[in-house]
C-alpha cells in the first residue's frame, strides 16, 4: 500500500496496536496528539487480539480501513453532522469495510488489466521494503524457509533504510 499510494512506513516496522473499528480514529493519528503514528501519512495494521491474546469485539481483522484527519473546521463539522465515529477531538475518523473479499477482488483486478490495460495496486513509489529478519540465531549457511516458516519473518521498513543497511528482501 505504501508503494502504491506514497504513504510512509514506521522506522522500526508496524506496531500492530490492538483495537476495534471504533478505536481506529484514536490509534491512527500522530503520536503528537496521542496516537501511534510517527507522523501523518503512514500505513499501519490494527491487531484483532488484545495484549492477552483474546479476540477483540468488533474487530477489523477481515476488513480494510483508512483514517482521515479533518484539516478544517468545516470538515470536522461534517463529521459531527454525519455522526461518524471520531477520536476525542473530533478531528480524526475512519472509513472501513468490514469484509475485504480478496478472492473476489482479484478477479476484478485481472479483468481491469485484460480489458482496459489498467493496472491496479501497482507500485508508483519505493517508500517501503519487506525485509527478512531471523526468528532465532541462525548459523552461517542456514537455508531460509521463507515467510511463515521457522527461520525468518517479514518486517516492513522504510526503503531507504532497507537499502542503506543491506537488508535481505523477503520477496522480490
Identify the meaning behind each predicted range.
Residues 1-172:
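C-terminal catalytic/substrate-binding lobe primarily of soluble NAD(P)-dependent oxidoreductases
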Amino acid at each position: 500500500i505504501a508503494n502504491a499510494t506514497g504513504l510512509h512506513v514506521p522506522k522500526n516496522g508496524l506496531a500492530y496496536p490492538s483495537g476495534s473499528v471504533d478505536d481506529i480514529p484514536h490509534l491512527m493519528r500522530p503520536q503528537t496528539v496521542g496516537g501511534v503514528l510517527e507522523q501523518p501519512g503512514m500505513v499501519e495494521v490494527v491487531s484483532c487480539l488484545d495484549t492477552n491474546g483474546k479476540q477483540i469485539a468488533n474487530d477489523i481483522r477481515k476488513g480494510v480501513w483508512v483514517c482521515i484527519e479533518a484539516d478544517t473546521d468545516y470538515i470536522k463539522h461534517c463529521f459531527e453532522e454525519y455522526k461518524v465515529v471520531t477520536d476525542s477531538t473530533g478531528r480524526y475518523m475512519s472509513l472501513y469495510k468490514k469484509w475485504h473479499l480478496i478472492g473476489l477482488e482479484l478477479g476484478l483486478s485481472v479483468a481491469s488489466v485484460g480489458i482496459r490495460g489498467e493496472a491496479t495496486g501497482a507500485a508508483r513509489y519505493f517508500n517501503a521494503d519487506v525485509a527478512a529478519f531471523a526468528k532465532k540465531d541462525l548459523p552461517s549457511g542456514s537455508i531460509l524457509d521463507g515467510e511463515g516458516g521457522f527461520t525468518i519473518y517479514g518486517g516492513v521498513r522504510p526503503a531507504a533504510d532497507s537499502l542503506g543497511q543491506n537488508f535481505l528482501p523477503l520477496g522480490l
